[in-house]
């Protein structure tokens, strides 16, 4: 038996907030989560953003918006409010950059992030290239990050 029981907040506190958003992450920590799983996608300019899908079909309002065809600057200005679940309640929530979790990691030494490299991500950048990118961005907090993926080939 694990004592105390430790849970991973999958995409943050996504039962109450739009998944993979900064509000979902911070609310999960406020609720006591010590492990947060987030998903990573890459933009056309090969920069990381936090999103499960490589498009806005579920989380945004533009079904034809695909990350691999857009620069990161365009992506991070898109709402990630999950209108199908929450209407416009979280319309101000945007697709976060990976760098946006740095202050959270710095302010919460008790929290570890599991960062999932999605299949679409590894089609744009191979696994080693992705690890190099993560290492550069997360260099000061790398000990608080675990990289996971179902597609390492």
Positions of the model-derived regions?
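Phosphate-group recognition and catalysis centered on beta-loop-alpha active-site segments
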Residues: 1-153
């Amino acid at each position: 038996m694990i004592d105390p029981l430790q849970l991973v907040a999958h995409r943050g506190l996504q039962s109450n907030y739009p998944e993979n958003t900064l509000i979902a992450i911070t609310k999960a920590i406020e609720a006591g989560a010590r492990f947060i799983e987030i998903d990573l996608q890459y933009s056309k300019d090969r920069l990381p953003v936090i999103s499960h899908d490589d498009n806005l079909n579920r989380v945004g309002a533009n079904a034809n918006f695909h990350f691999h065809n857009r620069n990161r600057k365009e992506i991070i200005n898109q709402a990630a409010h999950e209108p199908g679940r929450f209407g416009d309640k979280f319309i101000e929530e945007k697709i976060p950059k990976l760098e946006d979790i740095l202050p959270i990691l710095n302010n919460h030494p008790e929290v570890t992030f599991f960062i999932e490299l999605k299949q679409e991500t590894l089609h744009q950048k191979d696994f080693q290239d992705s690890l190099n990118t993560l290492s550069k961005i997360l260099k000061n907090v790398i000990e608080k990050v675990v990289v996971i993926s179902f597609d390492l080939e």
